[in-house]
Amino acid sequence: MKKKKQIGQKSIKIVGSNYLGEYNSTRKSCRAIVIEKDNILLSYETKTDTWMIPGGGQEKGETEKDCVIRELAEETGYLVEPIRCALTINEYYGNERFLLKYYLSTIKGKAEVNLTEKEKQNGMEPRWLPIKDAISIFSEHQKYAETDEMRRGLYLREYSALTKVISK
């Protein structure tokens, strides 16, 4: 059964230059856009100098909202309430599809951070950043086109998410 698109939810498609024209697997993930005043909650990797909207892979049997709650607690130490899915992004790279759901969310409390080994190695930590600064950082996605396709794709995705969802 096909899910109905929520009213007010936007959808965009990003196709990488290495996309092979069809995909044989889909990775689903959920991310949270958490805004307080004029600041947004981001995850920052101190060792790689990389910013991202917090979230991660949806586990088997897990609802999208449960994924948002779990991932934000693990990565940021915040308990959040996902309000609504504001954006769906379909990304295509190689022979894979990445389906990302962005939920507008609010903070409800604190949790214990539980980072993966890779996140620990990269020095991941939560940071609050003015929205305009986050948009500025992510807007520079094209400067990584020749040197870092992973970061280019990540920053293009996050820039697209913020500019589609936040109407400032």
Residue positions per predicted region:
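A generic structural micro-feature
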Residues: 24-26, 94-99, 118-123
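Active-site-adjacent beta-strand/loop module that shapes the phosphate/pyrophosphate-binding cleft
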Residues: 91-114, 127
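Short hydrophobic/aromatic beta-strand or adjacent loop that forms the aromatic wall/cage
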Residues: 27-31, 98-102, 159
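Conserved hydrophobic "DFG−1" position in protein kinase catalytic cores
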Residues: 34, 42, 104-105, 128
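Conserved Nudix-box catalytic region and its N-terminal flanking loop in Nudix hydrolases
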Residues: 35-74
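Nudix hydrolase/Nudix homology domain
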Residues: 49, 120-168
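A short coil-to-beta-strand element that immediately follows conserved catalytic motifs
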Residues: 79-87
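Acidic, metal-coordinating catalytic segment for phosphate/diphosphate chemistry
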Residues: 1-31
